[in-house]
């Protein structure tokens, strides 16, 4: 039976990533995310990070909600559920190790998948001559 492979980000385990400073972790990220972290976190992102740290300690028991879709998923966020705004509502997202280095907004889709109903009368040329029920 195959054992589940242990998660690694750029060769580092989750425990090693958790022990790194933000600057050390930023060096592992792709250029766009590295540049974003190098510029520093916005006040909204700092507030979100503060809430996440409190939730990890068990001192913040309300759902963590944010509009900050441009926040990069950091190793310390793993295991927490964050409600990310998609423009209409807050979508609950459980942070998994595989999400590290991505933006929160990538996981809360802003567009709904179109599910077409059955076509109405007059939708096609042949349906114009079908009797209406």
UniProtKB/Swiss-Prot annotation:
Output the Gene3D superfamilies linked to this UniProt entry: 30s Ribosomal Protein S19, Chain A
| GO annotation, cellular component aspect | cytosolic small ribosomal subunit
Pfam families named among the record's database cross-references: Ribosomal_S19
rRNA-binding found in the keyword field: yes
The protein's organism comes out as Thermococcus gammatolerans (strain DSM 15229 / JCM 11827 / EJ3)
Provide one Gene Ontology biological process annotation.
Answer: ribosomal small subunit assembly
| Key words of the record | Ribonucleoprotein, Ribosomal protein, RNA-binding, rRNA-binding
Give the function comment from the record.
Protein S19 forms a complex with S13 that binds strongly to the 16S ribosomal RNA.
Statement: the UniProt record of this protein carries the keyword Coiled coil: no
**What name does UniProt use for this protein?**
Small ribosomal subunit protein uS19
UniProt lists the family membership as follows: Belongs to the universal ribosomal protein uS19 family.
A GO molecular function term, named singly, is: structural constituent of ribosome
Which InterPro entries does the record match to this protein? Ribosomal_uS19, Ribosomal_uS19_CS, Ribosomal_uS19_euk/arc, Ribosomal_uS19_SF
Q: Which NCBIfam families match?
A: PRK04038.1 (NF003121), uS19_arch (TIGR01025)
């Amino acid at each position: 039976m195959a054992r589940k492979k242990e998660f690694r980000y750029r060769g580092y385990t989750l425990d090693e990533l958790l022990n790194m400073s933000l600057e050390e972790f930023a060096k592992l990220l792709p250029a766009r995310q590295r540049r974003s972290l190098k510029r520093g976190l916005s006040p909204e992102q700092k507030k979100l990070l503060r809430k996440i740290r409190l939730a990890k300690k068990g001192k913040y028991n309300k759902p963590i909600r944010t509009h900050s879709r441009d926040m990069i998923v950091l190793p310390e966020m793993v295991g927490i559920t964050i409600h990310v705004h998609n423009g209409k509502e807050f979508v609950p997202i459980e942070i998994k190790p595989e999400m590290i280095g991505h933006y929160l907004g990538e996981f809360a889709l802003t567009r709904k998948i179109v599910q077409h109903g059955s076509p109405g009368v007059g939708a096609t040329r042949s349906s114009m001559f079908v009797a209406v029920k």
